[in-house]
Amino acid sequence: MDISIIGSGYVGLVTGACFADVGHHVICVDNDADKIKQLKAGEIPIYEPGLEEIIHRNVSSRRLRFTGNIEEAVESSQIIFIAVPTPPLPDGDVDLSFVEKVAREIAGVLSDYRVIVDKSTVPVKTGEKVAESIKRYNRHGAEFDVVSNPEFLREGCAVTDLMHPDRIVIGAQSEHAIDLMKKVYEPFMAPILVTDISSAELIKHCANSFLALKISYINAVSAICEASGADVERVADGIGMDHRIGRDFLNAGIGYGGSCFPKDIAAFIAISDQLGVPFHLLREVQRINEEQKTRFLKTIRETLWVLREKRIAVWGLTFKPDTDDVRSSVAIEVVEQLLREGAHVVAYDPKGMHKARAIKAIADAEFASTAIEAISDAEALVIATDWNEFANIDLAVLREKMRTPIVFDGRNLLNPETMRQFGFHYYSIGRASVRPQ
């Protein structure tokens, strides 16, 4: 099928590349001329495992191309996906101006029937607004259908998630649009759930909020474990073995971040408030998430006493491993607070350095080129992102290079007993701290 994706960020680029890889002909559109120039030159502006290879393969086979021209995309495609940003507003709502702008641009060039698909994460009832905008600004009286098709991609696993989805959600009113969407997803051989548009829009917010709830739940439990001497990892294993609960997203740490969870939860709270049904549970999820960062920083403060002029290494800047995305990263927040208190921060991340350097709030940090360089002569190490590279570090080298062997593990990446044996003072989340033998 002929498909266009308007918006070539994380969601749009991965979606377009994977659609092309299963045989569709795809045009990815973006209004960022530099990004389109990069993509045409074979340079991939984001890091996502497996994505670069897929893009190069499908550009070579002429199933995937890039343009800044929406008119070209609309005229060439049966189905048009909207995958533009929906950034958060100060009140927790989301800015839908990019979605509205694209809807108007589509309307301006739409002359024949097309299916317009909301792929961006949007508040319930957005599909109705998109349809109204296209109808209002289309001068040709062209027929069209609007569909909600939320994405469930995890950065770092996005290619796998798209190629092997748990489910496909299609929210639509038209049987013709549903049939076309089923053809798009036929190669993926995944269960398809067909709903009304509002339900599809709500499913995305409900899913992300529930996952964030699991994270905040285990983080709240971690505080109880620290107070009682229990081990949060064993507690999580015990409850996660129940198939009704599952072990995923029960990893205690310094809280969730990224471009989705914080924004989507705030948006869901705003949506529920606007509907007159306040979602108090989600406010508590937010509170626990903030409290977890505060507790972690308090441990650092109480252990090191005065942070001013202390050399502190920070491993990890991205909001999670296997991505270069530093948006709303808890790791960045930790670095920012350490700098604010006068620490000399030396930071390292396997993939996020370029984007982290551009963040003004942490401009005073020193950026190392390797993990070992970061910890050389450090008075403490903070692990803020759970990259495999950090889990597999040579602890003897780590101990030798550090000035004082103090580690604050915000992701429970290392084994407490092993850290004790190697002579570290080790502090993690929801587990007893250890001291050298």
Indicate residue ranges for each PLM-predicted region.
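Structural/interface elements that position substrates and couple domains in central-metabolism enzymes
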Residues: M1-Q437
